[in-house]
Amino acid sequence: MTVRGDVLAPDPASPTTAAASPSVSVIPEGSPTAMEQPVFLMTTAAQAISGFFVWTALLITCHQIYMHLRCYSCPNEQRYIVRILFIVPIYAFDSWLSLLFFTNDQYYVYFGTVRDCYEALVIYNFLSLCYEYLGGESSIMSEIRGKPIESSCMYGTCCLWGKTYSIGFLRFCKQATLQFCVVKPLMAVSTVVLQAFGKYRDGDFDVTSGYLYVTIIYNISVSLALYALFLFYFATRELLSPYSPVLKFFMVKSVIFLSFWQGMLLAILEKCGAIPKIHSARVSVGEGTVAAGYQDFIICVEMFFAALALRHAFTYKVYADKRLDAQGRCAPMKSISSSLKETMNPHDIVQDAIHNFSPAYQQYTQQSTLEPGPTWRGGAHGLSRSHSLSGARDNEKTLLLSSDDEF
C-alpha cells in the first residue's frame, strides 16, 4: 500500500480494487483512461459531418464547372475560372481523406502535398484572369502608365513613394505570384522527404525540425504573393469594378491564405497545450497531428460555404447566352470534353513563367486576342474587322512594352 497525503491508495501490485475513501476512484487495469478515449476527430460523427459538407460542396462546384464547360463561349477567361473552381473539390476531398486517415500521420502529409501544389496554381490563374478581364498588359498600361503610386501605410504602398506605374510594376506582380507557384510545390516535396526521414512534424518549431524552416520559407513566399495581388488590385480596382472584384479577391485570398494562417494558429495552440494531445497505447498519433486534424475538419466545413460563394463570384450565366447557336442550343458533350482538356493544359502557365523571368521580357506581351464573331452574325466582314483591330492593338502593345521602365 502507498500513502498519498492522508489517503491510503492500493498498491498497484495488489489485487485489491476497493476504494480507500469516497474521493478516490480506482480504475481497473486495462480500462482506458480519460486521455485514452477517442477524441472527436476519431469518431464516426466527425467523419460523417465533414463528409456531408464535402460531398455537398463537390456537387455544387462540379455542376458549376460543368455549366462553364457547357457554355464555353469565352475560353480566354473561362479557362482560368474553371482552374480556380477546382480548388474546392481538391481542397475538400483531400482534407476529408486526411481526416479519414487521421491516426496515420504519414498519409495526411501526402494528401496535403497534393493540396499545396494546386493552391499555388490558383494564385497565378486568378491574376491571369484579372489581366484577361482588362484586355492584357497593353490595355492595362494604357490606363495606368505614368500615374503616381499613392503612398499609404494602410495599403502597404508607403515604400513606393515617388514611383509611378510602369511595365516593371506589372512584371513584379506576375513574378511575385509565379515564384509562389514554384516555392509551394518545392516545399511540399521537401515536406514529404523530411517526413520520410523523420525530420518533419506539424507544429514542431524545434531548430532540428524541418517544420520551422519550411514554415519560414513559405511565410515569405506567400506574403510576397499576397502583397503582389494586393498591389495589382490597388492599381486596377477602378478598371476591375465592372467585374465585381471584391468578392473574387476575398474568396481567393481566404481559401488559400487564411487557411494557411488558420493552420498556423492551430499548430501554435497545440504547442501551447490549448489543444490536448492524444496519449493512448492503442493509437499512435504524432506531434502536430491533432492540430492538422482539426484543420482538415474545419476546411471540410469551410469548403461548403466557399462553393456557394464561388458559385456567385464566378457565375456561368454571363457566358450562357454567348454559346447559343442559331437554334438556341448549347455545345454538345464532345465540345465539353475538349474544353476540359484545353482548360487542364498547363502550356500557358509554363510559357508565361519562361517569358516573365526572361531577360527579353520587354519584347514579351500578354495580350488577349479578339475572337472573331460567329459567322451567322458578322460573316467575313466581322472577321476582317477583328483582324484589323487586333493588328492595331498589337502596334499599341509594341509601343507600350518597348519601354525600359523598371518598377
From Swiss-Prot:
One GO term describing the cellular component: membrane
Extent of Low complexity compositional bias: 9-25
Spans annotated as Disordered: 1-25, 369-395
Keyword Iron-sulfur set for record: no
Top-level division of the source organism's lineage: Eukaryota
Transmembrane segments: 40-60, 84-104, 121-141, 178-198, 214-234, 249-269, 290-310
Phosphoserine modification, residue list: 388, 402-403
Membrane topology: Multi-pass membrane protein
Keywords noted in UniProt: Membrane, Phosphoprotein, Transmembrane, Transmembrane helix
An annotated Gene Ontology molecular function: transmembrane transporter activity
Any Pfam family the entry gives: Solute_trans_a
Coiled-coil intervals, chain numbering: none
SMART domains for the chain: Solute_trans_a (SM01417)
Localization annotation: Membrane
UniProt function note: May activate the MAP kinase signaling pathway.
Family label: Belongs to the TMEM184 family.
Name under which the protein is recorded: Transmembrane protein 184B
Gene from which the chain derives: TMEM184B
